[in-house]
Amino acid sequence: MSRVCELSGKAPMTGNTVSHANNKSRRRFLPNLNDVTLISDVLGQSFKLRISAAALRTVDHRGGLDAFLAKAKDDELSVKARAIKKEIEKAQATAA
């Protein structure tokens, strides 16, 4: 299981832990990933995704999974999220 957010593309970063004496040692900054179930209003279906806490706040801010995916760039999304986005767009096109 990779440590990459499926919606925002956040991945581990590297840097230094710096002590009070300014000694530096290498470390990894891992994203705060959570396994969540998000519901699509258009499809009436739930999806299990592994997303960061920041992405979850953004989903809430934009008004749900459908609105988030409509605004999201395809290159930031995982393959699974891109498939969900395509399903939602197809369902909205047939409903309109």
Curated annotation (Swiss-Prot):
- GO MF annotations in UniProt: structural constituent of ribosome
Q: Where is this region: Disordered?
A: 1-23
The GO cellular component terms are: cytosolic large ribosomal subunit
Q: Which UniProt keywords apply?
A: Ribonucleoprotein, Ribosomal protein
| Origin: domain of life | Bacteria
- A biological process term (GO) from this entry: translation
Pfam families the UniProt entry points to: Ribosomal_L28
- Family of this protein: Belongs to the bacterial ribosomal protein bL28 family.
Which PANTHER family does the record associate with it? 39S RIBOSOMAL PROTEIN L28, MITOCHONDRIAL, LARGE RIBOSOMAL SUBUNIT PROTEIN BL28M
| Protein name, as recorded | Large ribosomal subunit protein bL28
